[in-house]
């Protein structure tokens, strides 16, 4: 969904699709689209699928990033399911370059209530307060 992914990432993904979750062997097939076709798809996704309610600016100063990193590794143990630099679990998507892939507003709202986006998601709803969700978002956005 376009509310989730950044435009440049969408374009690159359509050029060279890959599996987002290490545990899954399924992936989007390569459709061998040219740049013009990819731009048309990107334009369509941005016009139709972006939810304005998910647009949000998150401060990504070093203090927030550090707090988010502590929350990720120490308080919530996110590395149990997610990999960063090939370290961590295999259940959730690898987060190495998540800051280049996802939009900050989407990350924030996903962290606050994952089941609102996908009722079958196994991502835990940790009942994050806004400050924690902002810090985790800042940390994740720093991963590029």
Model-derived regions, located:
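Short, charged low-complexity linear segments at domain edges
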Residues: 45-62
């Amino acid at each position: 969904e376009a509310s989730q992914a950044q435009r440049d990432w969408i374009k690159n993904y359509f050029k060279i699709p890959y599996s987002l979750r290490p545990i899954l062997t399924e992936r989007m097939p390569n459709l061998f689209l040219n740049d013009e076709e990819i731009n048309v798809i990107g334009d369509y996704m941005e016009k139709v699928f972006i939810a304005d309610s998910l647009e949000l600016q998150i401060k990504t100063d070093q203090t927030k990033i550090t707090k988010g990193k502590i929350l990720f590794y120490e308080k919530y143990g996110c590395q149990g399911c997610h990999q960063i630099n090939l370290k961590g679990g295999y259940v959730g998507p690898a987060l190495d370059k998540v800051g280049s892939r996802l939009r900050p507003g989407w990350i924030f709202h996903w962290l606050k209530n994952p089941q609102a986006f996908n009722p079958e998601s196994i991502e835990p709803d940790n009942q994050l307060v806004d400050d924690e969700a902002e810090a985790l978002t800042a940390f994740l956005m720093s991963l590029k």
